């Protein structure tokens, strides 16, 4: 086990230019708020490939566990299906280049934060008001964490509406009230997503000499 392909860019910056230089590197990569994750990783794990591989594997299995808990929370009677889906995700988590121990840390973190955020949202629907507020706030923090660390899961955020609809439909038979409750429960997460979209499209600017991956079409819609 070692480092592969994109891993070496992180190793180069952290080793030759200092761990704090990862902030510069990821700003050029259009993900300035992902730097904290890699800086923390190098400060804790150092430059030993085996340490990064173990951390990657632990995050992977943490995601699988959270996915299983999420499915069981939404569909308590679907025990077999929950295991099957979780095991399928363990083998194929929607991308093929899993052996990279460093370069895709923000992907694993995104999955981890996203799944935990969804689970907390589901719990918030099922408990009393005080606990619901606590779970909702924690879910919003995790939503912001995964969005600002990497934008990959921004589209998946719309899955929240589906989960909310399923859960609220079980308790509310009237369609108009169902729509209202789903929207009100989704609104806090929609505000977080809106704040991220505003920052990413309007506020954030790449360094002057860097133009790749710029959301030109989206920016033109707002200018």
How does the language model describe each region?
Residues 1-223:
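Polytopic membrane enzymes that build or remodel cell-surface glycoconjugates and lipids
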């Amino acid at each position: 086990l070692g480092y592969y392909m994109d891993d070496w860019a992180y190793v180069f910056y952290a080793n030759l230019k200092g761990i704090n230089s990862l902030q510069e590197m990821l700003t050029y990569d259009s993900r300035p708020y992902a730097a904290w994750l890699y800086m923390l990783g190098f400060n804790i794990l150092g430059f030993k490939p085996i340490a990064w591989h173990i951390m990657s594997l632990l995050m992977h299995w943490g995601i699988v566990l959270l996915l299983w808990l999420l499915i069981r929370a939404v569909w308590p009677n679907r025990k077999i299906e929950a295991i099957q889906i979780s095991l399928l995700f363990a083998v194929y988590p929607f991308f093929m280049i899993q052996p990279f121990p460093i370069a895709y840390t923000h992907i694993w973190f995104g999955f981890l934060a996203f799944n935990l955020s969804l689970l907390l949202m589901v719990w918030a629907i099922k408990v009393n008001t005080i606990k619901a507020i606590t779970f909702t706030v924690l879910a919003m923090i995790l939503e912001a964490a995964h969005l600002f660390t990497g934008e990959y899961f921004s589209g998946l955020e719309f899955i929240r509406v589906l989960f909310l609809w399923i859960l609220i439909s079980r308790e509310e038979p009237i369609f108009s009230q169902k729509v209202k409750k789903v929207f009100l429960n989704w609104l806090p997460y929609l505000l977080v997503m809106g704040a991220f979209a505003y920052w990413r499209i309007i506020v954030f600017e790449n360094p002057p000499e860097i133009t790749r991956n710029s959301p030109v079409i989206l920016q033109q819609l707002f200018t």
